[in-house]
């Protein structure tokens, strides 16, 4: 089983390196960072506790929402999806991402109290 998985993962990684643009790689790195931050927060919640609950909840909601916003940005910036997002330029997608993140973090800071 493991002998079959290694070549598949190797080919997947090689194709990703060759065909993915640098913009998408940066977005993917950001999404990976957010994913690990959310996992770390959840493990911390399980091991230590949720006191104060507002802080945990706002931090976890922030990571999940940031991941969703980044995935939306990735879909809009990807050249393979140009036919789906003809009215949205790359700059407009990035501006929407920044604006949505600004609103998100204003809500998160407000929720903290």
Curated annotation (Swiss-Prot):
<dbReference type="GO" id="GO:0006915">
    <property type="term" value="P:apoptotic process"/>
</dbReference>
<keyword id="KW-0053">Apoptosis</keyword>
<comment type="subunit">
    <text>Component of the oligosaccharyltransferase (OST) complex.</text>
</comment>
<keyword id="KW-0256">Endoplasmic reticulum</keyword>
<protein>
    <recommendedName>
        <fullName>Dolichyl-diphosphooligosaccharide--protein glycosyltransferase subunit dad-1</fullName>
    </recommendedName>
</protein>
<dbReference type="GO" id="GO:0008250">
    <property type="term" value="C:oligosaccharyltransferase complex"/>
</dbReference>
<comment type="pathway">
    <text>Protein modification; protein glycosylation.</text>
</comment>
<feature type="transmembrane region" description="Helical">
    <location>
        <begin position="93"/>
        <end position="113"/>
    </location>
</feature>
<comment type="similarity">
    <text>Belongs to the DAD/OST2 family.</text>
</comment>
<comment type="function">
    <text>Subunit of the oligosaccharyl transferase (OST) complex that catalyzes the initial transfer of a defined glycan (Glc(3)Man(9)GlcNAc(2) in eukaryotes) from the lipid carrier dolichol-pyrophosphate to an asparagine residue within an Asn-X-Ser/Thr consensus motif in nascent polypeptide chains, the first step in protein N-glycosylation. N-glycosylation occurs cotranslationally and the complex associates with the Sec61 complex at the channel-forming translocon complex that mediates protein translocation across the endoplasmic reticulum (ER). All subunits are required for a maximal enzyme activity.</text>
</comment>
<dbReference type="GO" id="GO:0043066">
    <property type="term" value="P:negative regulation of apoptotic process"/>
</dbReference>
<feature type="transmembrane region" description="Helical">
    <location>
        <begin position="33"/>
        <end position="53"/>
    </location>
</feature>
<feature type="topological domain" description="Cytoplasmic">
    <location>
        <begin position="1"/>
        <end position="32"/>
    </location>
</feature>
<dbReference type="Pfam" id="PF02109">
    <property type="entry name" value="DAD"/>
</dbReference>
<dbReference type="GO" id="GO:0006487">
    <property type="term" value="P:protein N-linked glycosylation"/>
</dbReference>
<feature type="transmembrane region" description="Helical">
    <location>
        <begin position="56"/>
        <end position="78"/>
    </location>
</feature>
<keyword id="KW-0812">Transmembrane</keyword>
<keyword id="KW-0472">Membrane</keyword>
<feature type="topological domain" description="Cytoplasmic">
    <location>
        <begin position="79"/>
        <end position="92"/>
    </location>
</feature>
<dbReference type="InterPro" id="IPR003038">
    <property type="entry name" value="DAD/Ost2"/>
</dbReference>
<keyword id="KW-1133">Transmembrane helix</keyword>
<feature type="topological domain" description="Lumenal">
    <location>
        <begin position="54"/>
        <end position="55"/>
    </location>
</feature>
